[in-house]
């Protein structure tokens, strides 16, 4: 057992089988591609990337887009790095830090999946988003969330566009899953 495998075991142990990984993680991540057609050289930060979702599937789908995956837990990043290296994914970089600590870089978009309340995600994202847009969508935060989001959205003070993942992928798992998009103002 290698060091990377040792790191990966606790992260992947909750995933029951390949179908679950594909449906619950890969497809869910790729739902972002249904609403955003990122142009080449777009720079995206994945906040709290965990085991690499949504960043890794999106990096495969958009090979000319630069993805910077950030997490405060180093073990998770080791798994992401091993996956990227093993799959030959060249458009991913990683950083072991909290997003609030990033001061010297700007991105076109921030993405996340099940990381923190929208209010926090927006507070962390807004300072690191570029002002100039290179895509059809205005630069901003795109996050994947589930459940009843009305209170969370209200408390965030933002006015996100909210799209149902179920309308993209007609699977029961996605009935209460949503994509939230907050434009940089």
PLM ranges: what are they?
Residues 2-9:
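Short, small-residue-biased leader/transition segments that mark boundaries at the very start
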Residues 14-33:
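Conserved SAM-binding loop and adjacent beta-strand
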Residues 30-112, 122:
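Conserved SAM/SAH cofactor-binding pocket of Class I
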Residues 36, 129-135:
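A generic alpha-to-beta junction signature in SAM-dependent methyltransferases
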Residues 66, 91-93, 140, 161-164:
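Conserved beta-strand segments of alpha/beta enzyme cores
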Residues 118-127:
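A short, conserved alpha-helix within the catalytic core of class I
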Residues 133-148:
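Conserved beta-strand signature within the Rossmann-like core of class I S-adenosyl-L-methionine
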Residues 148-185:
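Active-site capping/gating segments
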């Amino acid at each position: 057992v290698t060091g990377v495998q040792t790191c990966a075991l606790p992260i992947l142990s909750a995933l029951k089988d390949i179908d679950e990984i594909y449906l619950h993680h890969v497809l869910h991540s790729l739902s972002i591609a249904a609403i955003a057609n990122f142009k080449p050289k777009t720079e995206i930060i994945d906040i709290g990337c965990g085991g690499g979702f949504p960043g890794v599937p999106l990096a495969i789908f958009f090979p000319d887009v630069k993805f910077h995956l950030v997490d405060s837990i180093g073990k998770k990043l080791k798994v992401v790095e091993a996956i990227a290296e093993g799959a030959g994914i060249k458009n991913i970089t990683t950083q072991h830090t909290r997003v609030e600590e990033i001061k010297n870089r700007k991105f076109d978009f921030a993405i996340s999946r099940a990381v923190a309340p929208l209010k926090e995600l927006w507070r962390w994202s807004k300072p690191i988003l570029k002002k100039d847009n290179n895509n059809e969508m205005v630069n901003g935060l795109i996050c994947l969330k589930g459940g009843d989001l009305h209170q969370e959205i209200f408390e965030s003070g933002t006015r996100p566009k909210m799209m149902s993942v179920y309308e993209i992928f007609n699977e029961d798992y996605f009935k209460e899953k949503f994509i939230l998009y907050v434009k940089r103002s």
